[in-house]
């Protein structure tokens, strides 16, 4: 869904952002971890 897509996009952004921990979580495309970590 759109929320998951947004998280996948955030995975490509450098982790120097203040919410980098959320970016790391987003790399798994949500709670199910259905995506591939980047």
From Swiss-Prot:
EC identifiers of the protein: 3.1.1.4
Tissue-wise expression: Expressed by the venom gland.
Subcellular compartments: Secreted
One GO term (biological process): arachidonate secretion
Swiss-Prot/TrEMBL cofactor(s): Ca(2+)
GO MF term list: calcium ion binding; phospholipase A2 activity; toxin activity
Main location, first listed in the record: secreted
Catalytic activity, as annotated: a 1,2-diacyl-sn-glycero-3-phosphocholine + H2O = a 1-acyl-sn-glycero-3-phosphocholine + a fatty acid + H(+)
Keyword Transferase: no
Entry GO CC: extracellular region
SUPFAM superfamilies tied to this protein: Phospholipase A2, PLA2
Domain of life: Eukaryota
Cofactor note: Binds 1 Ca(2+) ion.
Residues annotated as binding Ca(2+): 28, 30, 32
Alphabetically ordered keywords of this record: Calcium, Hydrolase, Lipid degradation, Lipid metabolism, Metal-binding, Neurotoxin, Presynaptic neurotoxin, Secreted, Toxin
Name of one Pfam family that matches: Phospholip_A2_1
Function, in words: Snake venom phospholipase A2 (PLA2) that inhibits neuromuscular transmission by blocking acetylcholine release from the nerve termini. PLA2 catalyzes the calcium-dependent hydrolysis of the 2-acyl groups in 3-sn-phosphoglycerides.
Family that this chain belongs to: Belongs to the phospholipase A2 family. Group I subfamily.
Protein name stated in the entry: Phospholipase A2 1
């Amino acid at each position: 869904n759109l929320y998951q897509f947004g998280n996948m996009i955030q995975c490509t952004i450098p982790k120097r952002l203040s919410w980098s921990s959320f970016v790391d979580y987003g790399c798994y495309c949500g709670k199910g971890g259905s995506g591939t970590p980047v």
